[in-house]
Design a protein with these regions (language model features):
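Bacterial N-terminal signal peptides
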Residues: 5-17
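Oxyanion-binding "anion nests"
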Residues: 231-282
Length: 330
């Protein structure tokens, strides 16, 4: 529920910035505030914690705030961050020894609140997360392990969990050298995790080829998960927003986004306007069209067009609009 709410807010907020339509994202944002007024996302048997699910939800609220400039939306974001960031910049509940990229994601909201308020505690918290990434274990090729407990493995999820935060931090504090490694992480996934026949990206890559699920030749996992590829697509458009226009790898990232968009459009379900959970096995028993992943693709396609990374006439734009209007955002 938390991830679904976040992805719908983000998808609809960005889409409505591209097409004139009713403010579906505003309705979703209102429902989020009503459901979790204290700023901590809780569900049954889940009391709420510093985690990527809440971070992604706040990303959606940030997108909505950028579209409307409503003070209540920013207050909600700040209140949520303040539940975890103490006066000395410590992040309550953060498990540093886990080295999980998932726990970096909420740093984006911390950075946003710092840029608006300039309060030192938010800078300290963001700096701590940046320093955590400096300690992140890496594969032999230099890619981030997804977590300490997943050695030598890159997951597409990690692209979104870490790289947009890193890009925002690098741009905010003029750490230009960081953009080289940000591009390296994303382009390593593009090179190693994309199926050359379909253009789709596999969810995981074990460079050591030791995991039971890893192909003994490529190290890749067997399935193409829509949500995983959605994470990667969103990471690309969000990183490019911060990426220096004169950086030598910017064009490579735009090209990776175009490859991703082309593949996503090719495997979109023409009947529903959504994407199947296992993207290349549409209609198979047990498979289903997945709303969170569809919202992710809507977000990436719409923002990619709006920012000029994808062509205005791209078929994916119309597919994204139909999906958001008719199936997901209502």
């Amino acid at each position: 529920m938390r991830l679904f709410a976040a992805s719908v807010v983000m998808g609809c907020a960005v889409a409505q910035g591209l097409w004139a339509q009713d403010a579906s994202s505003a309705k979703m944002a209102e429902s989020v505030i009503k459901a979790w007024p204290a700023g901590v996302v809780t569900t049954e048997n889940h009391p709420g914690e510093w985690a990527y699910e809440e971070g992604v939800l706040l990303d959606g609220m940030v997108a909505q705030w950028h579209a409307t400039a409503t003070g209540a939306d920013f207050k909600y974001i700040k209140d949520a961050v303040d539940k975890y960031v103490t006066e000395d910049g410590t992040i309550k509940g953060y498990k540093a020894d886990g080295h999980t990229l998932d726990d970096i994601e909420m740093g984006r909201a911390v950075l946003l609140v710092y840029r608006v308020t300039q309060q030192p505690k938010y800078y300290k918290a963001a700096k701590f997360l940046q320093e955590q990434l400096a300690l992140q274990p890496r594969t032999a090729s230099g890619g981030y392990w997804h977590k300490q407990i997943y050695p030598n493995q890159m997951w597409l999820d990690g692209a979104y969990m870490a790289e947009p935060f890193r890009a925002a931090y690098a741009a905010t504090f003029q750490e230009r050298g960081d953009f080289d490694d940000i591009a390296k992480q994303l382009l390593l996934m593009d090179a190693k995790m994309r199926d050359p026949k379909t253009g789709l990206l596999l969810h995981g890559w074990d460079e050591s080829k030791q995991m039971p699920w890893a192909d003994k030749t490529t190290g890749l996992s067997p399935e193409v998960w829509a949500r995983a590829m959605g994470w990667y697509a969103m990471a690309l458009v969000d990183v490019l927003e911060w990426f220096p226009k004169d950086h030598p790898t910017r064009a490579d990232l735009v090209a990776a986004l175009n490859r991703t968009a082309t593949a996503a459009v090719a495997y979109q379900d023409k009947k529903t306007g959504l994407w199947w959970q296992v993207m290349d096995k549409g209609g198979k028993p047990g498979n289903y069209t997945e709303a969170s992943a569809s919202s992710m693709f809507v977000y990436a396609l719409a923002k990619g067009v709006r920012m000029g990374y994808l062509p205005q006439s791209d078929e994916g734009v119309e597919i994204g609009r139909a999906s958001c209007r008719e199936r997901v955002c209502r």
